[in-house]
Amino acid sequence: MLIGRRSRSAALGVEKKLLEAHVSELKTKPTEVSVESHIAAIANEEQRNDARTLVALMRRVTKQEPMMWGPSIVGFGSYHYKYASGHEGDSALAAFAMRGSELVVYIEASFEGRDVLLAKLGKHKTGKVCVYIRRLANVDLTVPETLVARSIEDTKRRYPQPNENGA
């Protein structure tokens, strides 16, 4: 009987982890939510304006219309990836989100010239694939444009898509 309870408990634990992984996966899927309504809901006016500026910048670079990826990521375009581990999925080619008081721009972790560009950006912090910017007024806006363009080039090189004729 005790073994049965442990087995059931272990099975429930595995089911919970699978459910959490599934829910986590669903958060990064495109949604039907309007990007403009998402941005309009940002309480701080300067952050709303910064988000609109990033939409214009990324639209110009990607030549794609924005769409919501999950509840908070504004993404442009998409690509399919598959890791050596076998894990695969879809992601936005270019994306940003408001995280608290900062804009987070998502870029590839390593591409030629990334560190040089980040040094020219202005006031920011970085994570592995994130660039945290408190205010766009504190950065040279030509740099995020170049960062996004180079990140997209690197992504397309690393994950060629079958429908892009080798691009």
For each feature predicted by the language model, list its residue ranges:
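Charge-dense, helix-prone N-terminal extensions
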Residues: 2-167
